[in-house]
Amino acid sequence: GAGLGGGSSDSATFLKMLNEQACLNLTCKELMEIGSRVGADVSFFASEALSANVSGIGEVVETYQEDALNIEVFTPKIACHTGKVYQTYREYFLQTMDTNQAQKMLSLPSTKLVEQFSKEELNDLFAPARKLYPELLLYAKEGWVFSGSGSSFFRIKEEV
């Protein structure tokens, strides 16, 4: 995949459409709970949050207020297999999180996060994706952040 949540957003959209068309009257919270059983990040897309810190496999969604960012996305012609990236993460890279650093990161706006932390610190999946797809290093440019399980990178565009 590209690491932009395409499959997850499609799944969440289907759940919302089914809820509406079948008159199920499920709440957003109920849709998020179903989404967490469907796949990674489906809960986030079902939440309708504009900005959120997402953890676990996307089932923990903590919203926050932040102005929309002007970003640029680059997707190299490398298809990263989401399941394999997560499996490699669990096998080789899973470690206990530094809770002090996590709290610091939660308190910062996105622009500061990108300025102050490395690609590896911002996305735990970058290292396992690199292990599986070493050619990603050709595209890991300064100022660009790895998106999801890959293969896209994004950066915050300078205001002009």
Question: What is each PLM-predicted segment?
Answer:
Residues 2-30, 46:
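DPxDG-like acidic metal-binding loop motif
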Residues 6-7, 146-151:
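Glycine-rich beta-strand-to-loop/alpha-helix junction loops that act as flexible
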Residues 45-143, 156-160:
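Conserved, helical-rich catalytic subdomain that frames metal- and/or nucleotide-binding sites
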